[in-house]
């Protein structure tokens, strides 16, 4: 069967549905069609084709709830070019744009005031130099608990963050590793929930039950560290009010603890929190606080689905639909979102703007609206050395994460002599608590064996150990039973050993960011610390490159006769 030339304008065979329209014609035999061909609409044929829609309606951008974003982009482009130019194809066909009834609804009037009005940012810079927690307005019961734990003066980042979070602002907390970021968000949260909160008139009538704060961490070690911090502040009688939901632990016991203890704070890893939430065992719709610790790691692709569920369910009123016309802005306003990390690359800034409501960036002695931060665009061409490229931003983030009171050195050694150099380094610096980093798990045991053979107490820590074994190793290391902890990249984040006075890189870190994370294990809370990198002669150029990127003096040295000898070296650019 063929279509004649005279019939092509009036009799066009169309396969139409609510999703697409396929047009066949102009002397095309059916037998030659193995699959339908999609061709452009002819001007004369367009007027004769009627769109067939099913009951569910057409698949449009409006039905996907992304129409507003497209319109915004079009308006932005029109502003740059001086006006919206009609499409040449649309003008040729005399097409009129179809207005969706979905878009005709007054969205702004439906939004609650809390989602529309911006919060007033009040900054009392005198609090940046606060000498006590009383000056920050914490409740008396909480201050008493802090005094019993020996915590009397806030750090710089705590002085800046506590008042901002107490004013109900969404915040991004950025400070170097070991500066006290965990307490910077825990203290204002515990001022609002739990037995240590400040008394209010609603206490007698408030029957809120369930989880009120969810803290997400990328690793089990960091999650358990946060749990211990909360338990320490709550005290032995109320530590049941915090529950860990980390991967690797027994899930059924975690679910039983949720049912029995009814915790107000949940701390866990994305996968386990999402898993228990999907099973209906964790209810977070009435949650008031969502904290994402080490958020730059939580933005990784492997956390995407779990983080999507957490962001959709935590602090969202039960009974609302995912396609509610109020949109994500209203849902964000139902909770207070706090993002925390030692590094704040451009990806974190974009995430904060998307997940939070008028967030502010909190640094030591500094609080600024996040909207004032310029987000660099990806560079397609070769970037200039002085350009504001994303790679330069990442390097700057690594610089910001380094504790300020560190000394950096590097020495050269043959691969087979690295362990002996490690031992001589520890003796020369008289270090008592040492963390040695390697890139792989397999050689850890060999390094521990060689150190033990020379009379130096050492142990290993890696991901293949079970949860109980890891906890035991960390406890013994913190208690001083082991002098050296040999580990891999697993512990570069979240490992909190305040007494650590020396970090040694037995293997070179992969980049300057990983160097900064490793170095952050020492020099915590203002203490002094030392970082030594042991490399081969052929690897010294990598150290010089990281020195340039981090803008810190990594000095060449050697260890002879039980002493540290520092060499002078001109910078090699």
Swiss-Prot record:
Q: Its Enzyme Commission number?
A: 3.6.4.13
- Entry keyword Transmembrane helix: no
SUPFAM superfamilies according to UniProt:
P-loop containing nucleoside triphosphate hydrolases
Find motif (Q motif) and give its ranges: 131-159
Enumerate the UniProt keywords alphabetically: ATP-binding, Helicase, Hydrolase, Nucleotide-binding, RNA-binding
Asked if the Swiss-Prot or TrEMBL record annotates the protein with the keyword Ribosomal protein, the reply is no
Q: What InterPro entries does this protein map onto?
A: DEAD/DEAH_box_helicase_dom, DEAD_box_RNA_helicases, Helicase_ATP-bd, Helicase_C-like, P-loop_NTPase, RNA_helicase_DEAD_Q_motif
Ranges where the Helicase ATP-binding domain occurs: 162-362
Q: Where is this motif: DEAD box?
A: 293-296
Supply the SMART domains for this chain. DEXDc (SM00487), HELICc (SM00490)
Residues that bind ATP: 175-182
Domain Helicase C-terminal, residue spans: 421-565
Write one Gene Ontology MF term: RNA binding
The reaction(s) catalysed by this protein are:
ATP + H2O = ADP + phosphate + H(+)
User: Domain text from the record?
Assistant: The Q motif is unique to and characteristic of the DEAD box family of RNA helicases and controls ATP binding and hydrolysis.
Family recorded in the similarity comment: Belongs to the DEAD box helicase family.
Q: Which PANTHER family is this protein grouped with?
A: DEAD-BOX ATP-DEPENDENT RNA HELICASE 47, MITOCHONDRIAL
Q: What is this protein called?
A: DEAD-box ATP-dependent RNA helicase 47A
Q: Which organism is it from?
A: Oryza sativa subsp. japonica
């Amino acid at each position: 069967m063929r279509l004649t030339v005279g019939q092509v304008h009036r009799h066009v065979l169309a396969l139409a549905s609510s999703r697409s329209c396929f047009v066949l014609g102009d002397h095309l035999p059916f037998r030659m069609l193995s699959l339908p061909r999609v061709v452009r609409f002819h001007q004369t044929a367009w007027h004769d084709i009627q769109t067939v829609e099913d009951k569910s309606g057409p698949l449009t951008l409006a039905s996907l709830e992304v129409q507003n974003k497209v319109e915004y982009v079009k308006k932005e482009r029109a502003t740059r070019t001086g006006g919206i130019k009609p499409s040449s194809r649309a003008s040729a066909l005399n097409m009129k744009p179809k207005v969706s009834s979905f878009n005709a609804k007054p969205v702004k009037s439906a939004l609650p005031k809390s989602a529309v009005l911006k919060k007033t940012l009040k900054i009392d810079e005198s609090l940046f130099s606060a000498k006590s927690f009383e000056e920050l307005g914490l409740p008396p019961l909480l201050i008493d608990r802090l005094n019993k734990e020996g915590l009397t003066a806030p750090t710089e980042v705590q002085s800046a963050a506590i008042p901002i979070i107490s004013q109900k602002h969404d915040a991004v907390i950025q400070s170097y590793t070991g500066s006290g970021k965990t307490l910077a968000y825990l203290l204002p949260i515990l001022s609002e929930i739990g037995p240590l909160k400040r008394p209010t008139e609603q206490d007698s009538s408030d029957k809120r039950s369930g989880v009120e704060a969810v803290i997400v961490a990328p690793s089990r070690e960091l999650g358990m560290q946060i749990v211990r911090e909360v338990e320490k502040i709550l005290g032995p009688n109320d530590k049941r009010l915090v529950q860990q939901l980390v991967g690797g632990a027994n899930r059924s016991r975690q679910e039983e603890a949720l049912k029995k203890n009814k915790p107000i704070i949940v701390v866990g890893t994305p996968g386990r929190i999402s898993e228990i939430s999907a099973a209906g065992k964790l209810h977070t719709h009435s949650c008031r606080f969502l904290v994402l610790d080490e958020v730059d790691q939580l933005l990784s692709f492997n956390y995407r689905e779990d983080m999507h569920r957490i962001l959709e369910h935590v602090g969202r009123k039960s009974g609302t639909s995912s396609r509610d016309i109020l949109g994500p802005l209203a849902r964000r306003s139902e909770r207070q979102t706090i993002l925390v990390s030692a590094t704040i690359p451009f990806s974190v800034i974009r995430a904060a703007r998307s997940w939070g409501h008028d967030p502010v960036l909190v640094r030591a002695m500094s609080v600024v609206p996040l909207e004032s931060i310029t987000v660099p665009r990806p560079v397609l061409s070769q970037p200039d050395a002085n350009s504001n490229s994303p790679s330069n931003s990442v390097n700057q983030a690594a610089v910001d994460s380094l504790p300020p009171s560190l000394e950096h050195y590097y020495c050269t050694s043959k691969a087979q002599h690295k362990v002996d150099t490690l031992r001589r380094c520890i003796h020369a610096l008289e270090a008592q608590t040492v963390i040695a980093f390697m890139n792989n798990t397999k050689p850890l045991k060999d390094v521990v064996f060689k150190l033990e053979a020379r009379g130096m107490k050492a142990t290993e820590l890696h991901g293949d150990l079970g949860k109980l074994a890891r906890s035991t190793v960390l406890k013994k290391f913190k208690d001083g039973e082991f002098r050296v902890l040999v580990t891999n990249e697993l512990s570069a984040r979240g490992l909190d050993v305040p007494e650590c006075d020396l970090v040694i890189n037995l293997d070179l870190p992969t980049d300057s960011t990983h160097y900064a994370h490793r170095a952050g294990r020492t020099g915590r809370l203002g203490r002094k610390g030392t970082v030594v990198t042991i490399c081969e002669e052929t690897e010294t150029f990598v150290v010089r490159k990281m020195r340039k990127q981090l803008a810190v003096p990594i000095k060449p040295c050697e260890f002879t006769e039980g002493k540290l000898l520092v060499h002078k070296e001109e910078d090699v650019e």
